Amino acid sequence: MSSSANSLNALSFDNSYARLPTHFYQKVAQTPLEDAHLISFNGDVAEALGLNRSQLDPEELARYCGGGGALETGESIAMKYAGHQFGHYNPDLGDGRGLLLGEVVTADNRRLDLHLKGAGRTAYSRFGDGRAVLRSSIREYLVSAAMNSLGVSSTSALCLVGSEEYTMRNGMEPCAMVLRVTPCHIRFGHFEHFYYLGQHDDLKLLADYCIERYFPQLQEADNPYLAMFNEVRNRTADLVAQWQSYGFVHGVMNTDNMSIIGETFDYGPFTFLDSYDPNFISNKNDTAGRYAFKQQPGIALWNLSALAQALLPLIPLDDLKRSLDDFADLYSAAFYGKMSQRLGLTQQGADGSLRQLIDDLLTLFAANNTDMNRFMRALSRYDGNESSLSFMSDLSCDSRGFSEWKARFCKHVDSSDVTLADRTQAMLQVNPEYILRNYMLEEAIREAHQGDYLPVQNLLKIVKNPFNAQPGAERYAEAPPDWAGAICLTCSS
């Protein structure tokens, strides 16, 4: 394969998952969208695939991704899996509107899946129509770019394709497709499917496939299956620590939405907190608050326990219990490590006093409805002078508690060997100027429904460069408008 191609069909394709037994999936062709057109594509993702961003033909991208032309990827497939949804096992899951088109084999021999969301009905669609709407597609397309740019592990999206086709969701809505790119589409629920059917040979075959493709370094371990589970646990702990440190609420942490490689996967009613609220629920359908912001670490452990249950035919129970027992410490180390970075205090290590400083700050955030990300960005500019902390009053952080916290923070800074300039530089690289808030997405979606896609393209530029101030984007660094709090999100997509 050449180092830079100008067409998707010029890439080198494979589909290793399709070489597994046919009951692992269903072969199905995508259903073309009516009058498909390209809304936006992510040049960085294109280059990761080996495409030349400057030579890509928008009409060709729309044709291939909208179903008007066949990609030479082999036969596209819908994967079968199961999962626990809101704590209840559901055996009747699978790719109900998405198709795994195949794997791009890059010049450096990496494998990246291409998965088309909104591609039409499959055997696993149940009562769904197999489509995705423009609203949810814009959200996934933009947030995947935002998360990757923040350094939070996430799937990517090559392009967003719109259409003149409509379907019923919140009223009649236009259909769209997103071409998702990630090394892995294996969910916790893939393993649950075979376990609960008692198909232990297939369970072993799936685990062997995952170790060979995603964790080849574990093949020589004493128990490769336990080593794989430990790696999934480690990555999951790190991922959720990243979420909590940036105030990200996934919204639907079902086991079928959990990736075994620790990526944020299957975006739905997600939210970045405008004000810090541990009890915040981003999904209106989550009436019990199972997936509230503060619950996410515990739910991650619950989901890992469900995966452990599914792996019992391969791993001794006591080994799995010991592995799960280590999750809390792994998560805490990752979370406090990330928060220490955000405070510019990494050189001290997350010792007891620093952890207490972080805990107390989060308590103050919750008590004062503080905008966590705006606070941390402003704190990055602390230059040793009291005046550089005046932003606390502007952010309603002028309580006695904040004054006491400020004094303790300054003491930590003063005891460090790191210069203020170096600390500021480091903090500005982990505390974003811009975070992708729901109101920003809502504005772009409203315009897109009127046929104006420029706001989507502008937001993509902003969220791909979140740590640097950008001309014309000043308002996105300010407090969200009052109406932002009334935005209602559900699982509808």
From Swiss-Prot:
The active site is at D256. It comes from the Bacteria. ATP binds at G94, G96, R97, K117, D129, G130, R180, R187, D266. It catalyses: L-seryl-[protein] + ATP = 3-O-(5'-adenylyl)-L-seryl-[protein] + diphosphate; L-threonyl-[protein] + ATP = 3-O-(5'-adenylyl)-L-threonyl-[protein] + diphosphate; L-tyrosyl-[protein] + ATP = O-(5'-adenylyl)-L-tyrosyl-[protein] + diphosphate; L-histidyl-[protein] + UTP = N(tele)-(5'-uridylyl)-L-histidyl-[protein] + diphosphate. Its EC number is 2.7.7.-, 2.7.7.108. GO terms for molecular function: AMPylase activity; ATP binding; magnesium ion binding. Its cofactor is Mg(2+); Mn(2+). InterPro entries: SelO. Keywords: ATP-binding, Magnesium, Manganese, Metal-binding, Nucleotide-binding, Nucleotidyltransferase, Transferase. Pfam families: SelO. Mg(2+) binds at N257, D266. NCBIfam families: PRK00029.1. Nucleotidyltransferase involved in the post-translational modification of proteins. It can catalyze the addition of adenosine monophosphate (AMP) or uridine monophosphate (UMP) to a protein, resulting in modifications known as AMPylation and UMPylation. PANTHER family: PROTEIN ADENYLYLTRANSFERASE SELO, MITOCHONDRIAL. Belongs to the SELO family. This is Protein nucleotidyltransferase YdiU. It comes from Hahella chejuensis (strain KCTC 2396).
